[in-house]
């Protein structure tokens, strides 16, 4: 069995890790950094860029650059580039493909299996969409695990004794809080809560709005309507936010941000930490509710928690740390890297599934209640939130009208009392019920949640034994045909990327060969015949011409000819130099590494 990798597929950054020699290791990407921006771009020439290259060109190509796609997972949102529409699953798959390729380059072997993390508060549609993205990228997703749980695994791998731990996970786009009990290799989630639309992106937006509103007051121009100016504002806002984690004030300087009839306009302002905290205070305060909810669900008080772990880049913000300290009455633990802990935890779980680690048991929970719609549009819960998974529960229902021969099962997820206020996961019909007065038939509805948190539902008429079951595939999820089409397209992109890399390598080798040949002629030109020089110069020129074109095979062929000509001359010169150094040969005078000797010109054309 090959290596199973652990992937933190984040809103703004992603990270991949693997177990090596019993220790989790974060895998650097091809650019040399340990986290990869979750950014995909398409150049006007149709080339696809992922990660740092995509992020770098965002200012000049904002319309064709896709960021924070994770926020749209499990929805019917589509991104249109030229005439093609992309689903969030496809864009996420491109990020996963990049992480997979980096892992393969690091490990020196093919990678086909992964554990991928999701926010604890992701619903069924979002989890299924993540699994589909993995398949499109060519990965068998062995397990979907919750991000706070993964972070707790990273923290608790080498800890002894029983501890109650709270994980406060505030990333680029999502917020989760989970409470776990850790002891003797068992990681049991007691409760989880969160907000799928809160994170660093929202803090950036507050700075963007502050800058844009002030600029509009002064100049009467709304920069948010100019895509290129808005992208510059986004990058400046993120930079300012990061700097204010360590500095009390930062300067935002954006020359030539726009222009009007009176000339170019610039932004040059200072943002203090106090002002930034004022801008985001309500967002940070909104994390307090889920923390209290999780504590209440776990039946614990803040003083019962032994350690508070901060995960996600946004927890570096001093106001966030102060808020957590205020609620919990203790300093948060700083011993884990907030950007890498989730990927490390995923790698540990991957090693557990691969059989490399034997003494760890992970008991996670379902974040939201599951049930069905019953008479009057009421939501009847079958599995309560924070139930340990995997789990299977059944409940008996009956018909609402006389002689009813079929029932529609409407599956829902959420906490609201009315069906219409909860997330619809799908519907199916159980037919063939024998006619009977209402209230007589007995229909058993069974919910089954697997270890990935993905839901399977069945309904059975106890009188006839007829049953109907579905794995939830809501309206936003992809059909098998769509997934197969996307897998094939992803392979085409992979092939394009491979060819592009190959072309770059061939061009680099050709450049290097020209440099080597020219340097040799410069250093040893007085030892070469004019015919040899002419031959090499001719082949150098052929390679240069080939490099100007797009025919990779022509570059290869020209490089091979230059290589042959160069090799022939080099071999002769080295043999001659070696011969002159032998006793009994011509006595040359050694000058450093250059040997002078008499030699006879052999004309190859004779």
From Swiss-Prot:
InterPro entries: ATPase_NBD, Chaperone_DnaK, Heat_shock_70_CS, HSP70_C_sf, HSP70_peptide-bd_sf, Hsp_70_fam. The keyword Nucleotide-binding applies. The modification Phosphothreonine is found at residue 174. One of its GO terms (molecular function) is unfolded protein binding. Residues 576-606 are annotated as: Disordered. The keyword Thylakoid does not apply. Keywords: ATP-binding, Chaperone, Nucleotide-binding, Phosphoprotein, Stress response. Residues 597-606 have a biased composition (Basic and acidic residues). It comes from the Bacteria. Pfam families: HSP70 (PF00012). SUPFAM superfamilies: Actin-like ATPase domain, Heat shock protein 70kD (HSP70), C-terminal subdomain, Heat shock protein 70kD (HSP70), peptide-binding domain. Induction: By stress conditions e.g. heat shock. Gene3D superfamilies: 1.20.1270.10, 3.30.420.40, Actin, Chain A, domain 4 (3.90.640.10), Substrate Binding Domain Of DNAk, Chain A, domain 1 (2.60.34.10). PANTHER family: HEAT SHOCK PROTEIN 70KDA. Belongs to the heat shock protein 70 family. Acts as a chaperone. This is Chaperone protein DnaK. The lineage of its organism: Bacteria, Bacillati, Bacillota, Clostridia, Thermoanaerobacterales.
């Amino acid at each position: 069995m090959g290596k199973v990798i652990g992937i933190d597929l984040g809103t703004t950054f992603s990270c991949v890790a693997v177990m090596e020699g019993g220790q989790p290791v974060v895998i650097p990407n091809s650019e040399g950094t340990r986290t990869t921006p979750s950014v995909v771009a398409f150049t006007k020439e149709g080339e696809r860029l992922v990660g740092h290259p995509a992020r770098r060109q965002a200012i000049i190509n904002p319309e064709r650059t896709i960021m924070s796609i994770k926020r749209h997972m499990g929805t019917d949102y589509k991104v249109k580039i030229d005439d093609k529409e992309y689903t969030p699953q496809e864009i996420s798959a491109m990020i996963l493909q990049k992480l997979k390729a980096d892992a393969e380059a690091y490990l020196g072997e093919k990678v086909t299996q992964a554990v991928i993390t999701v926010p604890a508060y992701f619903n069924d549609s979002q989890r299924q969409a993540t699994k589909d993205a993995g398949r499109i990228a060519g990965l068998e997703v062995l397990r979907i695990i919750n991000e706070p749980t993964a972070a707790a695994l990273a923290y608790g791998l080498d800890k002894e004794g029983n501890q109650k731990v709270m994980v406060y996970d505030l990333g680029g786009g999502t917020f989760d809080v989970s409470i776990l009990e850790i002891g003797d290799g068992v990681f049991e989630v007691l409760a989880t809560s969160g907000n799928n639309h809160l994170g660093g992106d929202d803090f950036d937006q507050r700075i963007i709005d502050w800058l844009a509103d002030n600029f509009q007051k002064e100049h009467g121009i709304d920069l948010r309507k100019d895509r290129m100016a808005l992208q510059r504002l986004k990058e400046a806002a993120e930079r300012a936010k990061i700097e204010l984690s360590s500095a009390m004030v930062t300067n935002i300087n954006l020359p030539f941000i726009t222009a009007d009839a009176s000339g170019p306009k610039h932004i040059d302002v200072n943002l203090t930490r106090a002002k930034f905290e004022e801008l985001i205070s309500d967002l940070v305060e909104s994390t307090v509710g889920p923390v209290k909810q999780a504590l209440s669900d776990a039946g614990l008080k803040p003083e019962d928690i032994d350690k508070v772990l901060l995960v996600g880049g946004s927890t570096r913000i001093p106001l966030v740390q102060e808020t957590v300290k205020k609620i919990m009455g203790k300093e948060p633990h700083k011993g884990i890297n907030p950007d890498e802990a989730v990927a490390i935890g995923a790698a540990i779980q991957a090693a557990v599934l691969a059989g490399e680690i034997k003494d760890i048991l992970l008991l996670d929970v379902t974040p939201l209640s599951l049930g069905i719609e019953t008479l009057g549009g009421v939501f009847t819960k079958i599995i309560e939130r924070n139930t340990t998974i995997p789990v299977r529960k059944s409940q008996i229902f009956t018909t609402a009208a006389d002689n009813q021969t079929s029932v529609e099962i409407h599956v829902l997820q959420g906490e609201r009392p009315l069906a219409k206020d909860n997330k619809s996961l799908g519907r199916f019909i159980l037919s063939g019920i024998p006619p009977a007065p209402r209230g007589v038939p007995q229909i058993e509805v069974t919910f089954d949640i697997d270890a990935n948190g993905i839901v399977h539902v069945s309904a059975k008429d106890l009188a006839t034994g007829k049953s109907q079951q579905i794995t939830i595939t809501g309206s936003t999820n992809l059909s098998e045909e769509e997934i197969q089409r996307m897998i094939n397209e992803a392979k085409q992109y992979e092939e394009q990327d491979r060819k592009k890399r190959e072309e770059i390598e061939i061009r680099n080798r050709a450049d290097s060969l020209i440099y080597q040949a020219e340097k040799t002629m410069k250093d040893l030109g007085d030892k070469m015949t004019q015919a040899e020089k002419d031959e090499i110069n001719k082949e150098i020129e052929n390679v240069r011409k080939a490099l100007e074109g797009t025919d990779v095979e022509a570059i290869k062929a020209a490089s091979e000819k230059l290589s042959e000509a160069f090799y022939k001359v080099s071999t002769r010169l080295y043999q001659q130099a070696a011969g002159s150094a032998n006793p009994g040969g011509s006595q040359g005078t050694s000058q450093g590494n250059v040997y002078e000797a008499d030699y006879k010109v052999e004309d190859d054309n004779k």
